[in-house]
Amino acid sequence: MPKDDSIEVEGTVMEPLPNAMFRVVLDNGHKVLAHISGKMRMHFIRILPGDKVKVELSPYDLTRGRITYRAK
């Protein structure tokens, strides 16, 4: 999938799940299941409930996403 096809939205982490997955509530009210991107995992960036994050969604499945950025 080309990189420019993904939809980037902001949201808030609600709860951590096993295997580096998180339940994220987007700013528009939708709930998605998101995992951490490889670069964030490589650099040991911690994500806690309540953190504001940027999530990339695929246009094919809008219920799953990838966390690409954690706001400071």
Curated annotation (Swiss-Prot):
GO terms for molecular function: ribosome binding; rRNA binding; translation initiation factor activity. The keyword Oxidoreductase does not apply. SUPFAM superfamilies: Nucleic acid-binding proteins. Keywords: Cytoplasm, Initiation factor, Protein biosynthesis, RNA-binding, rRNA-binding. InterPro entries: NA-bd_OB-fold (IPR012340), RNA-binding_domain_S1_IF1 (IPR006196), S1_domain (IPR003029), TIF_IF1 (IPR004368). NCBIfam families: infA. This is Translation initiation factor IF-1. It comes from Myxococcus xanthus (strain DK1622).
